[in-house]
Amino acid sequence: MSDKRTNVGQQFDRLPATDGDRTVEGRASRAAVVDFFAERFGIDPAVFENFSFWEKGKGKIWIFAADAPSPIRVEGLGMTVLRTRQEHWKPTQSAIQRFGRHATKNVIELDGEAAATFACGEDQEIDWDGDWGYLIATHTVGGEREPIGVGLYV
């Protein structure tokens, strides 16, 4: 008999520190989430040092700027940051707008017209020399590069 627990969709469970600490099959670990943002977007793991990560449902990862007992049955805990139980992990719009300014790779700067098209959710063909997959779209506002969302480059 397996000692693995099952996912309970009505509660938040803190992510295990590492894959070796996992007690629910398929659940991401804190290390894997932090590594994803570091490897995909070049975000320094130290950015996430004071945050806890939680799963509610299957693969909906939340980030919380504090700690709480685990499990906990509440409607929301921080903000959603990542979807993991699919082939390619997808960061949320909120995560990109909050943490995207720390990214050093897979960031595409959009001019005014392209940024407006992006904001409307329309597909567009843009030249990109980097990797395919999810990119952080940015636009310069007031002289500063601001993340406006996440887009899929194929």
Where are these regions (language model features)?
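Polybasic, low-complexity RNA-engagement segments
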Residues: S2-V154
